[in-house]
């Protein structure tokens, strides 16, 4: 199999209505919503440098609406791409792709990519992985903490053997009570060729057990392949950005605004008096999500949560942190605060006082 990106084909079904975005006040179809200065669909094409054979499968109503300029925008993003317009439907991405089978090279390696996310990953390494394993399909996945997973597990999840070979895949629910420790599908799906993809899609459309609330999802098209003993793998991506709902997109944009402000340096004027941070909660909701650290110590962008909160607040002459005596890891938390905040004095009913240069910092057990 060729690893030359020019020999591969990328299929992007983007014919959905985007009703949640429309209800939230967005005035263009979801793939055209701007994120960081360019439409979502441009971010997706940017994931595949060097690819030429691209097929956009669009809602014909969107193509016909002059305000959207959809065809013009797609042509400018990927001049070598083809655009297929299909009738509006609510049958899901598998159905959308099925309307354009005849536009695909049945022998070419094929990726079906949803139109509402982006990621940081190694595209070259992925093509080598597909060639070296000679597998039949790959689900591009992420794992670990991602903010959107705190309020929803409405994604496709994969159960694997040795974190590589897919054993099971299911939509809209994780396999365990610890979804952040599972592989979740990014929304990008590889098939060794379009002929195999078509066979899987057609069998999926014939099976009611693979239809979810009236829609056919690409993830579930791997079920027939797994049942036939096909070799389906997982390829882990580095960083994932979910924009599938207005809440997902808003959360991402808020996070990025914070990152920009953090990089520029927080500039609130120094305050006289005392900065008081209560850390007395036990973090029960995080514990239910299988976090093992006390909430103040959970890493956020590489630093404990309490330090990120402290860094974002105005500097003060004194810093006081209030901890519960029975909080698991309380002593480790106090030691970290001593070290990181460079406390001049830290006292509690159970821990000795220590003097260090820098702003005054006291901690005690409530």
Which ranges hold each PLM region?
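Conserved core of the sugar-phosphate nucleotidyltransferase
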Residues: 120-208, 331
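Conserved alpha/beta core of the MobA/IspD/sugar-nucleotide pyrophosphorylase nucleotidyltransferase superfamily
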Residues: 2-10, 106, 182-275
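A structural signal for short hydrophobic beta-strand segments in well-ordered beta-sheet cores
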Residues: 32, 158-160, 234, 297
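The conserved acidic donor/metal-binding loop of glycosyltransferases
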Residues: 115-118
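Short alpha-helical oligomerization interface
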Residues: 26-31, 291-296
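Short, flexible helix/strand-to-coil boundary loops that buttress conserved ligand/catalytic motifs
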Residues: 25, 170-173, 201, 253-256, ...
């Amino acid at each position: 199999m060729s690893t030359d990106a020019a020999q591969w084909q990328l299929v992007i079904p983007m014919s959905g209505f985007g009703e949640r975005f429309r209800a939230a006040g967005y005035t263009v179809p979801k793939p055209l919503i701007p994120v960081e200065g360019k439409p979502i669909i441009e971010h997706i094409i940017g994931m595949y440098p060097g690819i030429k054979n691209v097929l956009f499968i669009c809602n014909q109503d969107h193509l016909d609406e002059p305000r959207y300029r959809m065809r013009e925008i797609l042509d400018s993003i990927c001049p070598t791409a083809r655009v297929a317009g299909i009738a509006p439907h609510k049958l899901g991405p598998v159905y959308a792709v099925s309307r354009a089978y005849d536009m695909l090279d049945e022998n070419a390696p094929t990726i079906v990519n949803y139109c509402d996310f982006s990621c940081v990953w190694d595209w070259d390494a992925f093509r080598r992985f597909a060639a070296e394993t000679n597998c039949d399909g790959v689900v591009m996945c992420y794992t670990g903490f991602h903010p959107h997973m705190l309020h929803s597990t409405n994604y496709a999840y994969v159960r694997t053997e040795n974190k590589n070979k897919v054993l099971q895949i299911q939509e809209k629910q994780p396999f365990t009570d610890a979804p952040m420790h599972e592989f979740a599908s990014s929304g990008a799906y590889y098939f060794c060729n379009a002929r195999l993809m078509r066979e899987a899609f057609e069998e999926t459309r014939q099976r009611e057990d693979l239809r979810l609330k009236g829609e056919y999802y690409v993830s579930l098209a791997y079920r027939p392949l797994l049942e036939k003993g096909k070799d389906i793998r997982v390829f882990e991506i580095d960083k994932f950005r979910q924009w599938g709902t207005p809440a997902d997109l808003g959360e991402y944009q808020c996070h990025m605004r914070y990152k920009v402000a953090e990089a520029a340096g927080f500039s609130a004027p120094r305050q006289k008096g005392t900065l008081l941070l209560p850390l007395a909660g036990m973090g029960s909701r995080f514990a239910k999500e299988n976090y093992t650290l006390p909430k103040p110590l959970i890493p956020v962008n590489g630093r404990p949560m309490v330090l990120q909160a402290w860094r974002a607040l105005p500097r003060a002459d004194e810093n006081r942190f209030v901890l519960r005596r029975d909080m698991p890891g309380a002593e480790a938390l106090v030691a970290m605060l001593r070290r990181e905040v460079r406390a001049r004095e830290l006292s509690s009913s159970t821990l000795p006082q220590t003097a260090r240069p820098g702003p005054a910092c006291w901690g005690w057990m409530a």
